[in-house]
């Protein structure tokens, strides 16, 4: 019993000593943090956690990466990191990862770009100070500093680790950038949701409309969040004052509506997202997706479905950013840990190209229109068939939902895609072309004899009117032509074809028949390379 009493007295002495070591200000801050967490944290908190001896220990036991204590300097850096900002630093957007700080994006004309830092690099340390285990808010003050000062950053790129000297410079970041693409598509890149974002967005929309924008692409890639009010403002352009999200705090569930704007965006619109689209970005993307106001393209988003509130401690001696609620999409879908799944998952190609294609239709006979969800999007197949867009369109087709409705013109009937059509994807590149035949197991050095029922105008037969295209990449294979009389031509690829690959031999409508004018309707022969030995004749009636 005596030993127990001695131990109890010893432990009590330690607790009293630790308490006495805290200054009155620190003790007051600690008590205030305990009170705030007990009352406002999203989940009930164990009493033992609140009895920890310091703010840092309480937050460590809370095990919530989004609940953070700021010094006044760290809080100012946190505010500077949201939205439009001017600061002295190296010019990177970052996320915290276990090894250190991940570079999400390198700003144009920044010191980081000049030093060849790349997105995907991990910053391990700055001037020998490890960034491992730090939040982004804690890392920012370390990376920023007086203009003209030099720091040495240690970078991990793949398996390589190396150090780089970087000179800090003033970096200015507008949160919204707007430009016109393809003469009629308004492209708006929202870098983050700052307090000025809505006015910048409004100015961008108005300017793009004045330049002739008939559709919009909203780019939320690498946008890690910001002020909720700005996301709700921008959501109002698309969903009016309808519900934008559901929130669930410890004691209640509520619905938050978007803020209706003086003029909505009713033009066809597409949102781009990726794995670094988080928080307020996910709120905006989920809102337009649930209300069927826009198509979402890209990769599954980050999955940060919690909301934080900042509490000032004392008279400004510190600040507590605390998770106070979880949020869900308007339809109640969970975002935390799951993210927003795009309507079209584009991972191998640039989602921007896929979006441009879906908005490229111009009411011509070359359009193919897809109905995705409740919305229609038209592709100009002439653009889709160019080398720059071929691969992106191929992935787009492969990612179409099963049995997607499509039509070949405004006057034609809606049809439904099926697995066979998706395998023969030439239908979506050259929808009006007539299929002649399919050649299987064709050798790598194959020659093709094309036979016409009428005499040809040989001058109309050239590299633009007859093409051999590798189906998956869109690569054009150079050809030699040998005319056999007036009705036959032997076509020889200048390089060997690749075994196992598929090719399309295309006779375009511009080929002319003697005395008859242009062919009018294109022809396609599908080819699978194998080992068969023979001279194939392709007949064009």
Where are the predicted features?
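Bacterial N-terminal signal peptides
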Residues: 10-21
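Interdomain regulatory linker/hinge segments that flank or connect interaction modules
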Residues: 30-81, 425, 430, 445-449, ...
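PDZ/PDZ-like peptide-tail recognition elements
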Residues: 65-101, 105, 165, 475-481
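PDZ-domain C-terminal substructure recognizer with occasional recognition of PDZ-binding tails
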Residues: 99-102, 124-126, 138-178, 324
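A short glycine-leucine-enriched loop at secondary-structure breakpoints
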Residues: 111-122, 144-146, 287, 501
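Conserved PDZ fold ligand-binding element
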Residues: 112-134, 216-219
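C-terminal "post-core" interaction segments
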Residues: 179-217, 221-439, 541
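Acidic, low-complexity Ser/Thr/Gly/Pro-rich repeat segments typical of extracellular/periplasmic
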Residues: 418-541
């Amino acid at each position: 019993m005596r030993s127990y009493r001695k131990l109890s007295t010893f432990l009590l002495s330690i607790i009293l000593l630790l308490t006495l070591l805290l200054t009155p200000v620190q003790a007051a801050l600690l008590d205030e943090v305990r009170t705030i967490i007990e009352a406002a944290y999203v989940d009930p908190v164990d009493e033992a956690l609140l009895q920890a001896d310091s703010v840092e220990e309480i937050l460590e036991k809370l095990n919530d990466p989004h609940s953070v204590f700021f010094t006044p300097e760290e809080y100012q850096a946190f505010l500077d990191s949201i939205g439009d900002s001017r600061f002295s630093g190296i010019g990177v957007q970052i996320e915290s990862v276990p090894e250190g700080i991940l570079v999400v994006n390198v700003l144009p004309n920044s010191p980081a770009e000049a030093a060849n830092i790349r997105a995907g690099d991990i910053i391990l340390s700055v001037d020998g100070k490890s960034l491992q285990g730090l939040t982004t808010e804690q890392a920012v003050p370390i990376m920023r500093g007086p203009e003209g000062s030099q720091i040495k950053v240690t970078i991990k790129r793949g398996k390589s680790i190396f150090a780089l000297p970087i000179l800090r410079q003033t970096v200015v970041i507008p949160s919204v950038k707007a430009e016109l693409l393809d003469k009629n598509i308004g492209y708006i890149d929202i870098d983050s949701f700052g307090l000025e974002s809505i006015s910048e967005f409004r100015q961008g929309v108005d300017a793009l409309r004045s330049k002739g924008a008939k559709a919009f692409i909203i780019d939320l890639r690498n946008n890690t969040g910001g002020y909720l009010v700005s996301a709700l403002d921008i959501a109002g352009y698309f969903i009016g004052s309808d519900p934008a999200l559901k929130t669930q705090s410890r004691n209640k569930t509520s619905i938050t509506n978007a803020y209706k704007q003086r003029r909505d965006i009713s033009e066809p619109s597409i949102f781009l997202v990726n794995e670094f689209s988080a928080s307020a970005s996910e709120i905006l993307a989920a809102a337009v997706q649930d209300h069927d106001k826009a198509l979402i393209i890209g990769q599954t988003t980050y999955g940060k479905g919690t909301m934080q509130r900042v509490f000032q401690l004392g008279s400004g001696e510190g600040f507590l950013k605390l998770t106070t609620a979880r949020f869900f999409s308007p339809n109640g879908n969970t975002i935390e840990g799951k993210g927003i799944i795009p309507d079209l998952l584009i991972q191998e190609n640039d989602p921007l190209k896929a979006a441009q294609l879906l908005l490229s239709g111009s009411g011509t006979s070359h359009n193919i229109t897809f109905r995705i969800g409740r919305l229609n999007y038209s592709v100009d197949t002439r653009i889709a068939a160019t080398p720059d867009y071929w691969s992106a369109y191929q992935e787009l087709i492969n990612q179409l939902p099963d049995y997607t409705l499509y039509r070949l013109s405004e006057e034609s009937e809606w049809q439904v895609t099926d697995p066979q059509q998706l395998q023969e994807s030439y239908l979506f590149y050259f929808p009006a072309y007539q299929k002649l035949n399919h050649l299987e197991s064709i050798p790598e050095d194959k020659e093709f004899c094309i036979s016409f029922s009428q005499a040809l105008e040989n001058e109309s037969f050239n590299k633009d009117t007859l093409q051999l295209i590798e189906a998956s990449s869109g690569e054009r294979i150079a050809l030699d032509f040998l005319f056999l009389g007036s009705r036959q031509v032997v076509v020889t690829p200048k390089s060997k074809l690749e075994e196992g690959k598929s090719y399309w031999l295309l006779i375009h409508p511009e080929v002319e028949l003697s005395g008859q004018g242009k062919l009018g309707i294109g022809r396609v022969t599908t080819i699978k390379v194998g080992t068969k030995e023979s001279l194939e004749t392709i007949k064009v009636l």
